[in-house]
Every structure is written in structure tokens, then in C-alpha cells.
């Protein structure tokens, strides 16, 4: 049984109906997931790509140095409206720098 954690996102709500814990931040979801991994569970974390900046510290100061495998990540990638455009462009670069490979990237279009 997979455990799901993350910050609520209306764009992927059909994929996260069975969430175990709605978190107040992306780093909180990643911290809970780390504990689950250490307990032998297989968690999944979901977030919008705008939340990637919030998980950089926990990835580089907890997951990477202690060689904790990353949880599966369901990532909603948005490039519009305007305030999402830059993060949308650098999302894949950030994931590569973090050496994050266990990802499902859900591209989102924006209808105005």
C-alpha cells in the first residue's frame, strides 16, 4: 500500500483523491515521506512544480547525505499563467540537479 502526502492542488485532484495526509508545505510532505521510507513503506509525494524550491533543502540536507531513496513524486508542471512561467522552464533542470528520477510529470495547460 502506497502512502500519499502533499499540498492540495486542484489541477491534479483526480489523481490525489486517496491522499493520506494533506500537508501545509512541500517540505513537510517530504519529511513525512522520509520517515515512511525509513520504516519500510513506499510513499508518494505530490505537488505543483512551484513547490520544488521548497524541497531543495530537505533533499540536499537529509535525503542525499543519508542516502535515503527519494519517494515517488507526482509533479504538476505549470508554465502559465505568468507567475508559473520561469519555474516551468527550470523544473526539469532542478530535478536533474537533485538527481531525482522517480517522477511522474503531469504537464498542465492553462485555459484563459
Give residue ranges: language-model regions.
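Thiamine diphosphate
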Residues: 1-112
Amino acid at each position: 500500500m502506497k502512502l500519499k502526502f502533499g499540498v492540495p492542488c486542484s489541477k491534479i485532484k483526480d489523481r490525489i483523491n486517496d491522499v493520506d495526509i494533506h500537508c501545509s508545505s512541500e517540505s513537510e510532505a517530504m519529511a513525512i515521506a522520509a520517515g515512511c521510507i525509513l520504516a519500510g513503506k513506499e510513499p508518494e509525494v505530490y505537488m505543483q512544480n512551484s513547490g520544488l524550491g521548497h524541497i531543495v533543502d530537505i533533499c540536499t540536507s537529509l535525503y542525499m547525505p543519508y542516502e535515503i531513496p527519494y519517494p515517488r513524486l507526482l509533479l504538476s508542471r505549470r508554465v502559465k499563467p505568468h507567475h508559473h512561467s520561469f519555474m516551468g522552464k527550470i523544473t526539469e533542470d532542478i530535478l536533474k540537479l537533485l538527481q531525482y528520477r522517480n517522477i511522474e510529470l503531469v504537464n498542465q495547460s492553462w485555459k484563459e
